[in-house]
Amino acid sequence: CSPRRCSRHLATTVVSCARSFPPVSPTVASPAAATTTTHVATWHDALVTRIGIIGGSGLYNIEGFENQKWRTVKTPFGVASDQLLTGTLAGREVVFLPRHGRGHRILPSELNHRANIWAMKKLGAQWIISVSAVGSLQKKYKPCDIVLIDQFLDRTKRSANHTFFGNGIVGHVAFADPICEELRQLLLKSARRKKVRVHNGGTYVNMEGPA
């Protein structure tokens, strides 16, 4: 993240979920340089295996993100936070979504999580790395530190609005280990290899907004 961002946020939490993938090595470019042409997602997109990245308030640009195209995805749950940006990163297919929309215009309490995840899936995302800029009361966390969390505490009252289950569909997701450990360890090894200040393990507490 940029120094200006770092002065506002105590730590950056990286949330990993789903399957694993080999670590990537970024090089040069940014979503701001993406083509302005809008592409509508097609059935072919679902056949492309992609790494999904959801950027929070501290991540809008990714170095080395090439061949960029903004894509519009229709979902049965309404509109996602923004168009999704597809491209390649170190030779791998990637799809990026700015969680709060370009220009940071959507409050955390207004996010349409179901539409966001559905859109990611429709564009072939098999793994998702979600990045959030957060604060902490623990002194060991410094500005711009990365915390690879391994647990959640959900203190919101709106989880029923964000589930794919209900209305005749019953599902139970185990929450003992909500983060993909294999993917988390790959991210940890990659961060250490790059000599990035990273913390192994942590709990993300999600509070009720708006904030």
Per-segment meaning from a language model:
Residues 10-11, 25, 35:
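Intrinsic low-complexity, disordered N-terminal segments enriched in polar/charged/small residues
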Residues 28-39, 69:
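Short alpha-helix boundary/capping segments
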Residues 43-175:
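Metabolite-binding pocket within alpha/beta catalytic cores that recognizes anionic/polar moieties
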Residues 178-211:
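Active-site rim beta-loop-alpha module in soluble metabolic enzymes
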